[in-house]
């Protein structure tokens, strides 16, 4: 649906003129650099009409540009009105939004941005780039101009109660996590560490919340020194159970007090992550803060034994729900019934809700038929979504939050007869998926270094996909978790893959206007016993967590090697052996058919 943004832009430009801004930048993120935001923080979506999870809007006196990546080109082109220019990131000749700001400004002109919505390193780099290339000035505004335009209709910020993540799922207590953090701080020679990422706060204190849809986190900051810890959170969210849980470890203070405490602090060596906002950095003093790789991010990414146990168990239960759903949908459609994409997604959620550890979805289900599958992050509308066409490819990317883990799985199905091109491209993507599943690599390897394995077979035919190959997955936390992941962007070269990390493995192929195919398993990284250990290195590999059948109608066996056939048959055998005892009679029969040897 297209939102007409002319009036909103006119009001914003009036405010820009009052403050002397040539350009005003509206990022996607909230004050905690979150990828997914609550409704009150969806400022870029409000001003532009584009509601994908990634993108940046830059507004000028007569211009409005929306920058996003390949996952959202189709969606953005459908949602932006005539006031906007879509800037397709990664295409030759298309600047980044930062480069665009330098191109569109002159000496002494001002570029405005809410200082809480840009990270300190990004603000510092942009400030220097503007000064050197155009002579313009970056202004960190303490007001948000979009909020002013939004006015009274802006949604209220959530006030959901916090819950305690039980030690049997968390694996480590708050005292142990604080001890480990302080040891890391000593190694870095810092007096304090500012925790600003919401999933890091939640993980550190074994708490979960519901402030951001699909992500069990809550708005908070934390300041940890070598002998004290402070949690800045709206105290209306804190239950007696939470207070008891934190007693003796951390002092609870009002959320907004973090800024005054920062300004009055005597600390001089303060560690911050690269995701900490410019506003926080300036509150402490830019000369006092040191951007470092967050020790919490590293610890959180490597799942402990309890977290891995939970991830394995929740993926089994989730696999059962997915099989029950596809068995039901297959029978329903082939009996001549009709159902739209949204109602099908709702039915899948109903199967997941039958599990008593179910806490919600981990993202909005991508239930897409035919050409909608080519929209990589498609969301079926509640009203007017397409009827699932059994003669076309159906792509379903879904996941759930359970008390013991988080899931994310994509299966692409055909309930009729696919074309040769559909089978060919699906098989090429599946071959890339298998190549990653079977890889053995030395410790120290990054996700950036192995991304090519997933794309190689598509590349041979001059094909590719415009998204990353894998992202980290939290443990009853965010379904997208950095720095873990596999992809061609620099961020995936920043930290090596390590045993205990969980990532997705999800190559795909998309033909605009026709269909999309994606195959996604969650995997965990584990040590591999190799015959040799060159230079004494440890070798690692991937182990599937996701258990769900692949659509054999979309597999062309003539394109598979004997090793790939062996992998698929062994995987399907594991799927059937593990899931079948917990399935209904009809789902068990369906699964037997769809896990038969190739």
Curated annotation (Swiss-Prot):
Amino-acid positions noted as binding Mn(2+) 2 in the UniProt annotation, renumbered to this chain: 397, 408, 520
Chain coiled-coil ranges: none
Keywords: Hydrolase, Manganese, Metal-binding
Transmembrane segments: none
Its EC number(s): 3.4.-.-
Necessary cofactors: Mn(2+)
The keyword Transport is annotated on this UniProt entry: no
Domain of life: Eukaryota
Cofactor note: Binds 2 manganese ions per subunit.
One term of GO molecular function: metal ion binding
Residues the record lists as binding Mn(2+) 1: 408, 506, 520
EC primary class: hydrolase
InterPro entries for this protein: Creatin/AminoP/Spt16_N, Creatinase/aminopeptidase-like, Creatinase_N, Pept_M24, Pept_M24B, Peptidase_M24_C, Peptidase_M24B_aminopep-P_CS, X-Pro_aminopeptidase_P
Single biological process term from Gene Ontology: negative regulation of transcription by RNA polymerase II
An example Gene Ontology CC term for this record: nucleus
UniProt cross-references to PANTHER family, sorted A to Z: XAA-PRO AMINOPEPTIDASE 1 (PTHR43763:SF6)
Family from the record: Belongs to the peptidase M24B family.
Protein name, per record: Uncharacterized peptidase C22G7.01c
């Amino acid at each position: 649906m297209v939102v007409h943004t002319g009036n909103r832009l006119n009001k914003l430009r009036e405010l820009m003129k009052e403050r002397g801004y040539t350009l005003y930048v509206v990022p996607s993120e909230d004050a905690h650099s979150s990828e997914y935001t609550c409704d009150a923080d969806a400022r870029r979506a409000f001003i532009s009409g584009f509601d994908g999870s990634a993108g940046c809007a830059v507004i000028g006196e007569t211009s409005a540009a929306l920058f996003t990546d390949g996952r959202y080109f189709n969606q953005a082109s459908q949602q932006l009105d005539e006031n906007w220019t879509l800037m397709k990131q990664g295409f030759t000749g298309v600047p980044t939004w930062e480069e665009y700001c330098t191109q569109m400004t002159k000496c002494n002109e001002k570029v405005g941005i809410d200082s809480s919505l840009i990270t300190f390193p990004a603000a510092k780099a942009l400030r220097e780039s503007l000064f050197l290339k155009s002579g313009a000035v970056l202004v960190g505004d303490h007001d948000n101009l979009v909020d002013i335009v939004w006015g009274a209709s802006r949604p209220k910020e959530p006030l959901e109660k916090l819950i305690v993540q039980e030690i049997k799922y968390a694996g480590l207590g708050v005292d142990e996590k604080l001890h480990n953090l302080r040891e890391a701080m000593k190694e870095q020679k810092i007096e304090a560490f500012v925790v600003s990422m919401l999933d890091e706060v939640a993980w550190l204190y074994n708490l979960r919340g519901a402030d951001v849809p699909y992500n069990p986190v809550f708005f908070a900051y934390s300041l940890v020194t070598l002998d004290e810890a402070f949690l800045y959170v709206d105290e209306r969210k804190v239950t007696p159970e939470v207070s008891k849980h934190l007693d003796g470890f951390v002092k609870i203070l009002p959320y907004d007090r973090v800024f005054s405490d920062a300004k009055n602090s005597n600390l001089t060596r303060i560690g911050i992550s690269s995701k900490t906002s410019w506003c926080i950095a300036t509150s402490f003093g830019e000369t006092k803060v040191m951007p470092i790789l967050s020790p919490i991010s590293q610890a959180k990414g490597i799942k402990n034994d309890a977290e891995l146990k939970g991830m394995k168990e929740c993926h089994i239960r989730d696999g059962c729900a997915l099989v029950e759903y596809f068995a039901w949908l297959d029978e329903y459609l082939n009996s001549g019934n009709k159902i739209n994409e949204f109602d099908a997604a709702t039915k899948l959620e109903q199967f997941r809700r039958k599990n008593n550890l179910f806490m919600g979805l981990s993202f909005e289900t991508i239930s897409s038929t035919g050409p909608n599958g080519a929209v990589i992050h498609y969301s079926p509308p509640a009203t007017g979504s397409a009827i699932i066409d059994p003669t076309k490819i159906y792509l379903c990317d879904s996941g759930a939050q359970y008390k013991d883990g988080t899931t994310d799985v994509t299966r692409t199905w055909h309930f009729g007869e696919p074309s040769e091109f559909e089978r060919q491209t699906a098989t090429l993507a599946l071959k890339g998926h298998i190549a990653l599943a079977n890889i053995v690599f030395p410790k120290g390897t990054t996700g950036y270094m192995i991304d090519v394995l997933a794309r190689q077979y598509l590349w041979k035919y001059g094909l590719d996909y415009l998204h990353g190959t894998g992202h980290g997955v939290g443990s009853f936390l965010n379904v997208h978790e950095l720095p873990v992941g596999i992809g061609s962007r620099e961020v995936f070269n920043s930290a090596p893959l390590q045993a205990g990390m969980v990532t997705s493995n999800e190559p795909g192929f998309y033909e605009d206007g026709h269909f999309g195919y994606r195959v996604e398993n969650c995997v965990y990284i584990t040590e591999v016993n190799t015959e040799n250990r060159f230079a004494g290195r440890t070798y690692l590999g991937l182990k599937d967590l996701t258990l769900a059948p692949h659509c054999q109608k979309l597999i062309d066996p003539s394109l598979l090697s004997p090793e790939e056939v062996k992998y698929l048959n062994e995987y399907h055998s594991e799927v059937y052996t593990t899931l079948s005892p917990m399935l209904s009679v009809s789902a068990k029969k369906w699964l037997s058919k769809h896990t038969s040897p190739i």
